[in-house]
Amino acid sequence: MNGLENKYIIKNNKRLRYGYTTGSCAAGAASGAVRMLLSGRELSEVTLPTPKGITLTLALHDITRGDNYVSCAVRKDAGDDPDTTNGILVYVKAEKICCRDSETDNCEDIGTGASRPQIILDGGIGVGRVTKPGLSQKIGEAAINPVPRAMILKEAEEAALSLIHI
């Protein structure tokens, strides 16, 4: 059950099943990875709202833990849309990073003492890079469109805020 079981659109007199976007998959995986990283618990699914007001429940797959990271994936379901990304696993890796204190060489978690967690978003395998001006991101940044970028950052930040006291 993902929240879309009874959602359809009629197009050319055909009833087409709703699906969800790659951005929703990435946002769900980000939420799951951050929650598992900070809580130490295993999750099987996450719930998130879409920009259209639909609440999705997304299963988490291929969970991997390391010393300071958790990665997981959400499987894309494009519904009846002929999307070439249908069925792929969209991965996110959440990692604790630190800043070295120049005097003590101690590693301090980023976000300590800050009013909000500091979240750095970058693309991984399969995500292109901006190479020319004209997109909403700077040259060299991951080519993640504004709405999915905002969704990913929102879900990661909300997950972090729900589990840490800054």
Which role does the model predict for each range below?
Residues 164-166:
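Conserved small/polar residues in nucleotide/adenosyl-binding loops
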Residues 40-41, 58-60, 84, 132-134:
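Short, glycine/acidic-enriched capping/hinge loops at junctions between secondary-structure elements
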Residues 68-99, 108-161:
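A generic, well-ordered mixed alpha/beta core segment in the N-terminal half of proteins
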Residues 1-9:
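Acidic-glycine-rich active-site phosphate/pyrophosphate-binding loop
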Residues 44-81:
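Translation machinery proteins
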Residues 10-48, 116, 136-162:
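Alpha/propeptide regions of enzymes that mature by internal proteolysis
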Residues 42, 54, 86-88:
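Short, basic and Ser/Thr-rich N-terminal targeting/leader segments
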